[in-house]
């Protein structure tokens, strides 16, 4: 990594935000010296070294609003210029693999874990024993070798437009197998397997559920009903409320965002009855 100390400092902040929720801590000044939030206690040397590096570059795979807020908060706290590029998780994986140990960014922030695991296995991530990893509620939310640490979790499921289903006199799908019904042909949106970590997780989930061969067969059969493959994992959710997408596969928190932020009361969220990731 080019800016190692700033990278470590960013990870400390990310894990601390997991524990603190939406609380926004600002540095307090005592004369010319800044006093930072308590979770940075004892890290003065790290902060000084990070500032000396001057800039932090972030690849972000979460929603851009969240990414921008995190980067802005880091910059405000430490006075370190922070820039980001928003890419789907699969795109970041491909970019890191192409850069092959000579990265143009310092931090990978957000997204699904499968691409992180691939890059870790390829030796493309920097392990770090984070001081604040104890803020995570379980070891399952971090890599065993400290290559990555979780900052949020989501549930994979279906988002449906209830108005459109009623108009077509259709029942909402209750489970994965329902998505293969002929009546849903041309109604389902899913993200692209080549670019979106969400879609890669769908593949992983089906293989775990059905076994490799049957899982791949399921995906081939599902393709017959897919109308659109979006670049980003959140793409389907953004089109359900308008009715352009009747059934979207993705993380349910993306559907909640559409309901809360955009007032789409015609969006219903479904957790597959036989299980999910």
Regions found by a protein language model. Name each.
Residues 235-238, 262-277:
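Extracytoplasmic/periplasmic substrate-recognition and gating elements
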Residues 193, 233, 251-255, 272-274:
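Histidine- and/or cysteine-centered catalytic micro-motif in compact active-site loops
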Residues 49-51, 150-151, 198, 274-277:
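Short, flexible turn/loop "capping" segments at secondary-structure junctions
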Residues 1-53:
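Short, low-complexity disordered leader/linker segments with a strong preference
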Residues 52, 76-78, 101, 184, ...:
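Short, structurally constrained coil/turn elements
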Residues 114-118, 246-266:
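A ligand-binding cleft/hinge motif common to bilobed small-molecule-binding domains
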Residues 57-71, 83-99, 103-244:
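Extracytoplasmic ligand-binding site segments that recognize negatively charged/polar headgroups
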Residues 41-51, 57, 61-81, 158, ...:
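Short, polar/charged alpha-helical segment
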